[in-house]
């Protein structure tokens, strides 16, 4: 649970024993073949997630809304039969992922936030957000904000195998 600090004694003891910790998004994603659209960023996650969900829903697609909004993703996977899930995902939920692989991931923006959980290191926080794309392959899509300097820096450094699609509010981008 993102509500339990990574530095909590319980978490420390679990890690010491080599027990696998799994977030809800990681766990639930292992039990569905639905396409997952995962949205993260420092600001605008809820609005963007809701907008994408409503666009798909209004197109009569079988879609669930989860992550930090809507119903529990795991409960929906257990009880519903959706073809798509639109998930709002926080950096905390991405911290412990090992296999989570959205079909489409979207990183809206980065700004120094929750730094107390990341050793007061902005780049460490940004890397946590980029974990959304770490398991994606070349048949998946990573949509990112080209105007964001930290995103540009990390894209140069990280070996992401995913198809990258930039967006910009400052410049016209070519296809």
Locate the predicted segments by residue.
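Short, intrinsically disordered, charge-balanced linker/junction segments flanking boundaries
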Residues: 161, 165-175
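Phosphate-binding loop of NTP-binding sites
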Residues: 2-146, 150-162
């Amino acid at each position: 649970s993102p509500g339990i600090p990574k530095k909590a004694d319980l978490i420390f003891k679990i890690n010491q024993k080599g027990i696998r910790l799994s977030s809800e998004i990681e766990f639930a994603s292992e039990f569905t073949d639905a396409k997952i659209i995962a949205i993260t960023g420092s600001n605008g996650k809820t609005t963007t997630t809701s907008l994408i969900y409503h666009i798909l829903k209004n197109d009569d697609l079988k879609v669930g809304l989860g992550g930090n909004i809507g119903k529990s993703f795991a409960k929906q996977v257990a009880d519903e039969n959706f073809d798509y899930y639109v998930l709002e995902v926080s950096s905390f939920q991405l911290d412990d992922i090992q296999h989570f692989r959205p079909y489409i991931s979207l990183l809206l923006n980065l700004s120094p936030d929750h730094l107390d959980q990341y050793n007061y290191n902005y780049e460490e926080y940004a890397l946590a957000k980029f974990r959304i794309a770490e398991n994606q392959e070349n048949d998946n899509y990573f949509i990112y904000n080209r105007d964001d300097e930290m995103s540009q820096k990390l894209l140069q450094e990280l070996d992401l195998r995913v198809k990258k699609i930039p967006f910009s509010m400052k410049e016209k981008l070519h296809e």
